[in-house]
Amino acid sequence: MMKALVVGGSSGIGLSLVLQLLHSDKVEKVYVVDKAAFPESHREERVDYVCCDLSRNDFSVLNRMNDIQALYITAGFGHLDFFQKLSEPYIDDSFAVNAVAPIKIIHRYYDRLLAQEDFACAVMVSIAGRISSPLFSVYSATKAALSKFIEAVNVELEVQGSRNRILEVSPGSLKGTGFTGGESQPELTADLAKEIIEHATRHEELYIPQYEEVFKDVIARYEADAHKFGVESYWYKKNSGRA
């Protein structure tokens, strides 16, 4: 039997991960840490929800969750707009929630990653952290920081003899997550949640959904000419009505 922690598990892909974990009879408990309340429609006795605002930099609620064998961090937010329109509090909160909180939470459980026992760990990053993303300047900066952190720490885990790794999950836009507003639709992200759990359980380091179909070409175009790619990215967002 195992216990898992899902940070950001009340909505979006986090909620889908919780529901997929609960499908397994090997899962004894799923801790859910989120600012938003866990949906009543999905509550059951194996779900242990605790309210926590990651922007407050207080993770003491995790003190009693030291018996987990899997960690999934999905909390994060972003706002599409010109940089000059973003407030300083927004910038502070963006880095606190999207980058600092995941890093500090992983630090709390790092002894589990270093140990010889299996410890599954996955963090939702974003393809925006790997390419030029105008109008997502601060969001992409927070995700780039997180991506580089994961990349470096995975090497540290390897050279210290651990087989555990942190899985970076870097998708593009996802339907059903409620990221850009609206309700979460976990049925639309169920397959992705299954994939994340499988990749994390295999101790893989990077998972980009739809890589072959979409993002292999996207990344190649960015690496060929980052400036041209950035300009095209801006106009794509503008012409598609996202900006």
Task: Report the location of each language-model feature.
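N-terminal Rossmann NAD(P)H-binding glycine-rich loop of SDR-like oxidoreductase domains
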Residues: 10, 14-19
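Residue(s) in the substrate-gating loop at a strand-loop-helix junction
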Residues: 126
